[in-house]
């Protein structure tokens, strides 16, 4: 069977090994080697993991090292090469395997140094080929061509040129030295496949990878014309069709990958697993996560168990295909698998040192991401903080930590962490993207624009960059705001029956970064015993937004009772830090004056001040004071305390407790509008937000609310207040956010319990 396997007939031997329950160490090594000859890299690793605690011959470890290298798991490959060399330190093939893997991992200087030591023994064609390979990876194409030329046999004809030599000539712009017509179809297909493979090398820069992929695409275009209708080139034509998927993926042409894949499926062409992974990656990047999840589940799961030989990139794509499909159990399964199968550190054979295991770090990064998207931000913060501070030199971990701080509503804390990360690699794309998001939150518009412009120029197709650019583009749009309410069945004395309250405002795009102009219209009406009250407002103003500061000044013409009067408003707030904010508002012809008062010719001016304390997304409180000076000599003082305590959170449900206290005092008593001498409300409530559907920036949720409390009014005693509410809210494509809520309330007015049934609505639209 071994002899047959060497001839290419590997299946009988593989079947025999699979049926045996007991194997010697040499037989295990045979199994590993034959599986490698069969091109079953993942099977090699599966078998090795089953017998990893046995002392295998060096050839067994070497086979596993090659399999790991084929799967681009460089560190695992290097560990196995070290094991093989510890048993056979003079084996030149093993030394070359280690050297080539070092080059793949980006350790070019170490690889060249070890190769120089190996070459010092005696000239060897294989060493020259290894040298050319390293120079090709480093971009030293002249040295690559020199080494390849030295490796050629004397008097080699063009038809005998190896694929690597042809590539070396092309890398040095010497393609004219090659007569493509004299190259065999297999060599031309090999060249195309090699270009695609090189375009995926993670140690190359993005520009290098794009340039290589462009060469592969150009070569595909030429070969496609030659072989499309040539029945003698069917095998080679099918090869380049599959490899074409990889070149398109490297160039971030995700929709082209998908359409090409669909064309191949229609022709009945078999797509190998590694090419299906390219397709799944394209679906994921094109925001079609469920299709990506379907393909990856078929590729990477054995029944319900995740394969043990996945690369870090494959694990990440599988994880995000679950997460972005809202499949949290699946994402958690990948997370647990990654953590449970990966030790924190890897020890290099033959050395006392150990190095951090990137896969273990990735697993804990998954853990924090699942917590973040499951609305468990405290756990996400704990995980990312521990990782960031235990690995201070890891920039990515600190960026992840800053992202969680930003999600918790602490942009200044996030900004500080990003400053620390900046020391390591100031122009890292992910760093600048996160800095731009923080700048947007802090209203540092110019800084956000500069950072966004830089990353868009460098990595325009990066998904994080695309998302950031979209946010900045939306910020620069005009904005329409509509808000109001309408009564359905009301008995309350303030707003009247079948009341309507509507405000529509249009904001201009940002002017000189910080300014926006706005104009709008307001309308309110209600039916009272003394007649119908109507108020119309025409308003215009300016808004200022900068770091820590928001200001808005408004002038309004208010029409009521067949006359019009000028009104004005000045509002603003200031943030001291991530936790504390103070704000105030001054208003002439205030909107705090009830509609019924204005129906009876009573107006008023008001002043308001408030303090807000924000701990995090799970707890916040605010205290406000308002004073209204009515034109009928009444003076009203109002004090309120409002808060939020999160008592439950899960991926689809959030429940908050909303304590609320309100105190009001008036100096005049006999007025045509509701005007208690003193009143005090305590009405705690609960609000539940249930996510019905979400896809990236689009979501649909429903909100339930209920509250029961008490209201005390001087001379009328205490009575019960009850509140119920149900609403829905839609967010769409970053430009629409709209909601409507049906509310019912029953409360005492001057000793009589009366009810109000009404609808509140609001919409923000960017255009």
Positions of PLM-derived features:
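Gram-negative and organellar
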Residues: 8, 14-17, 24-26, 30-32, ...
């Amino acid at each position: 069977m071994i002899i047959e396997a060497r001839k290419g007939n590997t299946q009988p031997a593989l079947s025999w090994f699979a049926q045996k329950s007991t194997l010697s160490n040499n037989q295990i090594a045979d199994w590993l080697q034959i599986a490698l000859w069969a091109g079953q890299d993942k099977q090699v690793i599966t078998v090795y993991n089953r017998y990893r605690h046995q002392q295998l011959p060096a050839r067994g470890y070497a086979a596993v090292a090659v399999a790991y290298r084929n799967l681009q798991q460089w560190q695992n490959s290097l560990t196995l090469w070290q094991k093989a060399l510890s048993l056979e330190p003079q084996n030149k093939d093993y030394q070359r395997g280690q050297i080539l893997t070092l080059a793949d991992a980006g350790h070019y200087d170490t690889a060249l140094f070890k190769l120089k030591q190996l070459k010092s023994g005696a000239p060897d064609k294989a060493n020259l080929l290894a040298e050319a390979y390293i120079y090709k990876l480093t971009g030293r194409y002249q040295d690559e061509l020199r080494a390849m030329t030295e490796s050629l046999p004397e008097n080699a004809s063009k038809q005998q040129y190896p694929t690597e030599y042809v590539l070396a000539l092309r890398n040095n712009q010497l393609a004219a030295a090659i007569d493509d017509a004299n190259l065999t179809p297999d060599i031309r297909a090999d060249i195309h496949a090699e270009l695609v493979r090189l375009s995926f090398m993670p140690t190359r820069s993005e520009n290098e990878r794009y340039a290589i992929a462009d060469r592969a695409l150009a070569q595909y275009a030429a070969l496609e014309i030659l072989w499309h209708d040539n029945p003698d080139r069917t095998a080679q034509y099918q090869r380049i069709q599959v490899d074409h998927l990889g070149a398109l993926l490297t160039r971030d042409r995700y929709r082209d990958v998908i359409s090409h894949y669909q064309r191949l499926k229609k022709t009945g062409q078999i797509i190998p697993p590694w090419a299906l992974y390219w397709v799944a990656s394209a679906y994921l990047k094109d925001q079609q996560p469920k299709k990506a999840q379907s393909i990856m589940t078929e590729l990477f799961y054995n029944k319900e168990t995740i394969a043990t030989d996945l690369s870090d990139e494959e694990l990440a794509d599988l994880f995000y295909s679950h997460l972005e499909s809202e499949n949290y159990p699946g994402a958690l399964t990948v997370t647990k698998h990654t953590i449970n199968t990966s030790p924190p550190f890897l020890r290099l054979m033959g050395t006392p040192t150990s190095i951090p295991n990137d896969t273990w770090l990735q697993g804990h990064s998954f853990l924090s991401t699942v917590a973040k998207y499951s609305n468990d931000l405290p756990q996400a913060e704990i995980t990312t903080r521990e990782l960031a501070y235990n690995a201070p030199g890891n920039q990515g971990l600190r960026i992840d930590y800053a992202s969680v701080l930003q999600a918790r509503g602490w942009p200044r804390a996030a900004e500080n962490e990003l400053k620390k990360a900046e020391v390591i690699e100031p122009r890292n794309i992910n760093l600048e993207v996160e800095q731009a998001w923080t700048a947007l939150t802090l209203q540092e518009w110019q800084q956000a624009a500069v950072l966004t412009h830089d990353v868009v120029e460098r990595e325009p197709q990066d998904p994080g960059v695309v998302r950031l650019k979209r946010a900045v583009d939306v910020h620069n749009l005009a904005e329409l705001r509509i808000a109001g309410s309408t009564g359905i069945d009301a008995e309350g004395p303030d707003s009247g029956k079948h009341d309507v309250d509507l405000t529509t405002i249009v904001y201009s795009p940002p002017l000189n970064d910080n300014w926006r102009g706005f104009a709008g219209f307001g309308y309110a009406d209600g039916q009272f015993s003394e007649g119908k009250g109507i108020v119309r407002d025409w308003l215009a103003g300016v808004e200022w937004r900068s770091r820590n500061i928001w200001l808005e000044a408004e002038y309004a013409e208010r029409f009521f009772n067949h006359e019009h009067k000028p009104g004005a408003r000045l509002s603003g707030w200031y943030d001291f830090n991530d936790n504390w904010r103070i704000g105030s508002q001054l208003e002439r012809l205030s909107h705090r004056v009830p509609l019924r008062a204005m129906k009876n010719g009573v107006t008023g001016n008001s002043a308001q001040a408030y303090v807000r304390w924000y701990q995090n997304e799970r707890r916040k409180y605010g205290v406000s004071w308002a004073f209204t000076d009515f034109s009928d000599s009444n003076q009203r003082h109002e004090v309120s305390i409002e808060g939020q305590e999160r008592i439950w959170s899960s991926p689809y449900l959030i429940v908050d407790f909303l304590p609320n206290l309100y105190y009001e005092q008036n100096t005049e008593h006999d007025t045509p509008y509701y005007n208690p001498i003193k009143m005090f409300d305590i009405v705690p409530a609960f609000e539940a937000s249930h996510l019905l559907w979400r896809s990236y920036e689009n979501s649909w949720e429903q909100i339930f609310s209920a509250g029961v409390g008490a209201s005390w009014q001087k001379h009328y005693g205490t009575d019960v207040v009850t509140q119920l509410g149900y609403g829905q809210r839609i967010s769409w494509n970053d430009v629409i956010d709209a909601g409507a809520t049906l509310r019912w309330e029953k409360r005492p007015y001057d000793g009589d319990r009366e009810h109000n049934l009404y609808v509140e609505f609001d919409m923000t639209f960017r255009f």
